[in-house]
């Protein structure tokens, strides 16, 4: 099938008037949310990767519910999450002097990896260079196979980290923490946890974990997000989300995604974001027919992948010496947060689409964001970027109407950019067509497929490539759990009037609780680097709060929290730099920026408190390092029992 016998009749031709992007938020609902079409999506909450039925122990990945042994019911430090973030927190704590027995990780997944555990769709890979994204490469002596490795390799690396530091014995999988409550008498957190199984006939179990310290290491890319799809119960075909891929239906496996069972199938994909950009070319290779439903075009740049040459690795990457990975990460950060390229006295080590996209610093913050000419310069270089992108699409996609629909004309800081090698070429295939629904989305699902306007598209399979539920900026809501601090005050209550933190990792009234930003903390495109700097800082705080006297052998309880003055001062320092993100207000309500996520109901002063550190990641890291060098724990109240 061609892109369409009359592409112009499909692309932007619906009788419905285009709707504003602001309507998008109301139509998006998280799985398990009140507006989810539960009857068809209930399978999305199960774990498709569990296979064994043996009785599990801590660290196992089986699917039978269990009661944890007594040793797991108390922990010095509870880490919620066992993806790259949780692993980094655990490793940095061990390196700071804590023992394995001090640490307990819990995760709702059946294994290590976080988003790389859940996501195993065809074409999955990192779009940040693997040499800087995969954590602890220096310590594990691992050499990634490619510049951008597959999801399978990313998950294997998580398991490698866990094995090296023996974290499997101190991890509870298939365990969900739903509530954290502070006990001010015992100076500890009481975590309500439940273990579960995919076997619905078996009941899960509920228990408590008492922890002296708690760290929220939940990532943002683990909970699938789906549109509120009218008519979903009428559809009789197969439907699943990319984060719960069904290889039994498509054929293939995560390691070898040869989807030979789709050769006679009509497949539809909803979405054209980062996930869709990776999965669409793979589906196009195998599906009999592929129809892509696009609400707004993705901002897709070119990604050139290559095998890692070991001689090059030795002579170029490791040549930087000790801490080479951190240096490479910080070189990357410098190039993506500085449109003033001539001022950078350094070589671009990563040399990819990210480092050629410095206007994205509008969304990340940077040392130059507060300069008077910054926005004009950002707009100028972003215009050049868009023109180059449009030329690439026009020269690649043969059908002019399709090429026009695939071009994203918005500023480069309003959407997270996507990168791929071969995405646009996919639309030249005879079995692929694009259905552009400008700013509106599909009309409804029918018994046989998808309706857009007055046209029905018959489909055997619908793949939801609709991303992940980011949640609110409140750490409790982002982690999808209830947190009550001193006086039973909920974190959501405190966040309602705008956050106050120390360094973006602690907040008063919630002692011994830590979280990795993003409000009032530094941010960058490389989330692993963000987690690592937070882990380094938090490990220092917990370790140095322990008493150093001989009497400390009895391990007295300790309460750590910011002083009221210190967290308010840090909040005001953040507010004073919030103008660095002023240009994000040019983005529509459907964008992923903080301004768009908070919405118009939040006033300017509150919004400024929610912003990241406006001077960028390098400035933020330097402030944390200088704070630690003073060794006085300034701004923290430390009380021993």
Swiss-Prot record:
Reaction equation(s) it catalyzes: protoaustinoid B + AH2 + O2 = preaustinoid A + A + H2O
Pathway this chain belongs to: Secondary metabolite biosynthesis; terpenoid biosynthesis
Site (Transition state stabilizer): 416
Cofactor: binding details: Binds 1 FAD per subunit.
Polar residues: compositionally biased ranges: 48-65
EC number: 1.14.13.-
Binding site for FAD: 115-118, 127-128, 133
Residue positions binding NADP(+): 125-127, 272-278, 295-296
Gene Ontology MF, one: monooxygenase activity
Keywords: FAD, Flavoprotein, NADP, Oxidoreductase
Stretches the record annotates as Disordered: 1-69
Name of a matching Pfam family: Pyr_redox_2
Names of the cofactor(s): FAD
Protein role: FAD-binding monooxygenase; part of the gene cluster that mediates the biosynthesis of paraherquonin, a meroterpenoid with a unique, highly congested hexacyclic molecular architecture. The first step of the pathway is the synthesis of 3,5-dimethylorsellinic acid (DMOA) by the polyketide synthase prhL.
Protein name as it appears in the record: FAD-binding monooxygenase prhJ
Gene assigned in the entry: prhJ
């Amino acid at each position: 099938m061609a892109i369409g016998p009359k592409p112009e009749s499909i692309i932007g031709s619906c009788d419905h008037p285009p709707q504003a992007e602001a309507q998008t938020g109301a139509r998006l609902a998280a799985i398990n949310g009140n507006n989810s079409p539960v009857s068809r999506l209930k399978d999305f909450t199960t774990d498709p990767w569990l296979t064994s039925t043996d009785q599990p122990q801590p660290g196992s990945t089986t699917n039978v519910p269990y009661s944890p042994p007594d040793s797991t019911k108390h922990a010095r430090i509870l880490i919620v999450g066992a993806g790259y973030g949780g692993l980094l927190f655990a490793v940095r704590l061990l390196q700071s002097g804590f023992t394995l027995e001090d640490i307990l990780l819990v995760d709702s997944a059946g294994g290590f990896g976080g988003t790389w555990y859940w996501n195993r769709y065809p074409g999955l890979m990192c779009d940040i260079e693997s040499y800087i994204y995969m954590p602890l490469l220096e310590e594990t002596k691992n050499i990634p196979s490619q510049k951008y490795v597959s999801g399978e390799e990313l998950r294997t690396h998580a398991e490698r980290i866990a094995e090296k530091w023996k974290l499997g014995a101190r991890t509870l999988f298939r365990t969900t923490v739903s509530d954290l409550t502070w006990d001010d008498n015992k100076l500890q957190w009481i975590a309500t946890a439940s273990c579960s199984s995919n076997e619905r006939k078996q009941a899960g179990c509920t228990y408590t974990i008492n922890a002296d310290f708690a760290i929220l290491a939940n990532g943002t890319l683990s909970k699938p997000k789906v549109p509120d799809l009218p008519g979903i119960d009428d559809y009789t075909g197969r439907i699943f989300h990319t984060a719960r891929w069904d290889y039994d239906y498509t054929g293939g496996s995560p390691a070898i995604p040869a989807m030979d069972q789709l050769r006679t199938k009509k497949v539809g994909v909803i979405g054209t974001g980062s996930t869709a950009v990776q999965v669409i070319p793979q589906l196009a290779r195998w599906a009999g027919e592929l129809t892509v439903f696009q609400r707004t075009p993705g901002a897709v740049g070119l990604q050139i992948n290559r095998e890692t040459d070991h001689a090059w690795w030795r002579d170029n990457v490791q040549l930087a010496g000790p801490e080479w990975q951190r240096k490479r990460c910080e070189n990357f950060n410098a190039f993506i947060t500085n449109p003033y390229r001539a001022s950078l006295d350094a070589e671009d080590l990563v040399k990819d689409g990210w480092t050629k996209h410095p206007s994205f610093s509008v969304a990340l913050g940077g040392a130059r964001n507060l300069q008077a000419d910054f926005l004009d310069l950002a707009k100028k270089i972003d215009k050049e970027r868009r023109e180059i992108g449009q030329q690439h699409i026009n020269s690649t996609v043969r059908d002019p109407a399709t090429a026009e629909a695939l071009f994203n004309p918005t500023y480069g800081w309003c959407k997270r950019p996507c990168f791929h090698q071969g995405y646009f070429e996919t639309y030249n295939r005879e079995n692929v067509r694009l259905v552009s629904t400008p700013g509106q989305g599909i009309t409804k699902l029918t018994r046989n497929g998808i309706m857009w306007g007055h046209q029905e598209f018959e489909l055997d399979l619908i793949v939801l490539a609709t991303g992940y539920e980011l949640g609110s900026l409140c750490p409790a809501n982002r982690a999808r759990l209830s947190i009550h601090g001193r006086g039973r005050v909920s974190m959501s209550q405190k966040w309602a009037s705008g956050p106050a933190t120390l360094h973006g990792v602690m907040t008063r009234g919630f002692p011994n609780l830590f979280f990795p930003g993003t409000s009032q903390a530094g941010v960058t495109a490389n989330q692993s680097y963000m987690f690592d700097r937070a882990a380094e800082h938090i490990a220092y705080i917990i370790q140095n709060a322990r008493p150093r006297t001989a009497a400390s052998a009895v391990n007295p309880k300790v309460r750590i929290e910011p002083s009221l003055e210190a967290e308010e001062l840090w909040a005001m320092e953040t507010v004073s730099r919030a103008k660095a993100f002023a240009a994000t207000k040019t983005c529509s309500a459907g964008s992923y920026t903080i301004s768009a996520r908070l919405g118009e109901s939040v006033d300017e002063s509150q919004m400024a408190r929610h912003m990241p550190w406006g001077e960028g990641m390098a400035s933020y890291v330097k402030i944390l390092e200088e704070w630690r060098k003073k060794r006085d724990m300034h701004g923290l109240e430390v009380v021993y029992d």
